[in-house]
């Protein structure tokens, strides 16, 4: 047995030999290789997933170092998906890594998503892209889990999975929900579930203030500004990583459950 094979013995002993085969055969797409997506990709690789497709077009920036796995002083200005792919191959040389150096949009949505994925993990922060992907996957019965905003939070114990229609105190998920209802025909009944899982947090957000302090209230100066890396929510790796790990845990459980169900039906 090679060192690479030995590296995943623990995963097989956790899920069982038969279920682990399903994980090794799985093809999972990660959209957005950033504060959450890098941890998603890492967890998938260390779980022995057989094929991973990474979709992103960003380069590593110094402002990413606080929360992104690929962000090091030595990797600044390098292409994120390439840095992540090199890391995955060093973890699991047998993993097939596909790179799509693009941002998901109207012109490439079909090309990016119509690839026989077992699961799509939406870790991007574009509302437009998230809405398109959720709608596309739902109507084609492609399993997808979307991830809400991980900024402005300090308590990883508050991270959980709920139906996208039922998130609280998550501006990103709320905006996504609004777009899905207004542009994609999702139910406007506030009690109706979307049947799309969302990783989110119940923690009240910490907003940066112009004087350098932090408050639970959004200041007038912050309210009209774009919440980007330089002036938006602060973030820490132990929260963004938790979002990613919880998403991967659910995805692997779903893949294993589907495999077991199909085996029982034989």
What are these regions (language model features)?
Residues 36:
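Hydrophobic/small residue at the entry helix of a nucleotide-binding pocket
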Residues 63-70, 153-163:
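Acidic/polar active-site rim loop that often engages polyanionic ligands
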Residues 30-32, 55:
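Conserved N-terminal Rossmann-fold NAD(P)-binding element of oxidoreductases
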Residues 1-29:
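N-terminal charged helix/coil linker that caps or initiates catalytic domains
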Residues 49-92:
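Glycine-rich phosphate-binding loop and adjoining beta1-alpha1-beta2 segment
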Residues 100-109:
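Conserved SAM/SAH-binding loop
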Residues 2, 115-119, 124, 129, ...:
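Glycine-rich phosphate/adenylate-binding loop
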